[in-house]
Amino acid sequence: MNIIDDGKSEEVVEVDPPKPITPKSDNSTSQSNNPQESNKMRAQIARVTQRSKQEVPHYYLSTEINMDKALEIRSQINSKLENQNIKISINDLIIKAAVETLKKYPIFNSRYENNSVITNDEINISIAIALDDGLILPAIIGCNNKDIKDISNSTKDLVERTKNGKLTSAEYTKGTFSISNLGMFDVNNFLAIILPPQTSMLAVGSVKKTPVVGVDDSISVSNIMHASLSADHRVTDGAAGALFIAELKNNLENPVNLII
């Protein structure tokens, strides 16, 4: 029931109750109930995600990351790179932090195929990019050999070519670890579905000013970001995942590790 107040009168008027509506006797179907065929991209997403949830035993670990130092060092880097037309984003720092973490814990940079775990030599970070027809996760190839500037340039180039339909076969198929960032949509936290045959995926939310209690019980305000790791339980256990996400947290809270 909708109630509309026009603000013009406080008079109460008695009205007859509405008569019941008799359903039409024809066999027409409401338009809202008509099935809609999925487009090709939506259908592919459905197949991949359904397969992942049915076949991959996911486990999830989440943490809060203080991004104060990361934001500070990002500002410093961008000031120095201003004349080079390079601007480092928060997502660039997250990608670089994930790469350094994967170097220390390479089991999360593996794939699961034919009941075997294969650790990939190269770190190719797949990033979730939203398009009009759905979602795609192309890969930045060779992140293990890229510094923060290279990652920034590669990411911008990849996003542009994704939107123009100019990806290479390797960028479509050779990802080894995925990152989905919904921070730009004001999402705090979420859990991602692993993209097989990859065995891990990182989900990050927005950076928000949040009250933080210090070791001396003092309260301050910091820039906090939630991050969640989705991992394949056939490949790793919770303890290994905890070490991974703790290292990722350390890399972002001490970002000097990302630029030296």
Language model regions located:
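C-terminal catalytic/motor cores of large multi-domain enzyme assemblies
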Residues: N2, G7-I260
